[in-house]
C-alpha cells in the first residue's frame, strides 16, 4: 500500500516509523504475560489522538488481545488493564506510588523510564530488562552512555567519565 504523506513545496523532512501487526501482537502478549506472571496492573499508553494510524494500531491490537486472550485471567487475578494517552499516563505515573507495569513503545519507554528513574531517585538505581515473548531476557545499562564525553574524546579533548560513580 502506498500513501502520500506530504507534498513538499520546498525543502523539508519526513520521519517514518514502521512496524508489523505480528510484532505488535508479540509485544502485547509479552506485556500481558508479564503482568499475569507478576500479578500487577498493566498500563499502556500512546498518542493515538495525534498518530491516528500508527499509535491507534497499537491501541487496537492491545485491546483485541486483552479482550480475547487475557481479560478472564486478569479478572481472576484481580488485576487491571488500563489504556490512556501518554501525556495522561505521565501525570498519573508521577503522582503514583508504582506497583504496576507501564508498557510503552520503544522511544516512549526509553524517555519515560529515564524520567521516572530521575524523579524517584537516580538513574543508577534503575534496571533495564528486555523480555522476548519466548522468555529470553536481555539486560543492559539503563542509564545510557555519556555522549557528550564521547564527542569530546573524538575531538581529542580530555574527559573525566567515572563509571564507578553509578555503583552504590
Predicted features by range, described:
Residues 17, 48, 89, 155-159:
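Residues at structural and domain junctions
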Residues 93-168:
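Glycine-rich phosphate/nucleotide-binding loop
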Residues 3-84:
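Glycine-rich phosphate/diphosphate-binding loop of Rossmann-like nucleotide-binding domains
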Amino acid at each position: 500500500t502506498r500513501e502520500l504523506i506530504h507534498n513538499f513545496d520546498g525543502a523539508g523532512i519526513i520521519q517514518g516509523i514502521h512496524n508489523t501487526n505480528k510484532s505488535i501482537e508479540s509485544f502485547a502478549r509479552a506485556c500481558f504475560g508479564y503482568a499475569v506472571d507478576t500479578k500487577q496492573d498493566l498500563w499502556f499508553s500512546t498518542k493515538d489522538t495525534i498518530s491516528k494510524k500508527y499509535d491507534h494500531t497499537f491501541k487496537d491490537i492491545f485491546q483485541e488481545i486483552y479482550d480475547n486472550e487475557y481479560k478472564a485471567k486478569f479478572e481472576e487475578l484481580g488485576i487491571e488493564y488500563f489504556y490512556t494517552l501518554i501525556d495522561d499516563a505521565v501525570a498519573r505515573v508521577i503522582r503514583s506510588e508504582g506497583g504496576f507495569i507501564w508498557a510503552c513503545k520503544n522511544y516512549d519507554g526509553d524517555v519515560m523510564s529515564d524520567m521516572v528513574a530521575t524523579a524517584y531517585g537516580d538513574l543508577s538505581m534503575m534496571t533495564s530488562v528486555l523480555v522476548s515473548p519466548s522468555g529470553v531476557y536481555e539486560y543492559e545499562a539503563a542509564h545510557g552512555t555519556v555522549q557528550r564525553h564521547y564527542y569530546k574524546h573524538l575531538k581529542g579533548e580530555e574527559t573525566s567519565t567515572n563509571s564507578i560513580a553509578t555503583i552504590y
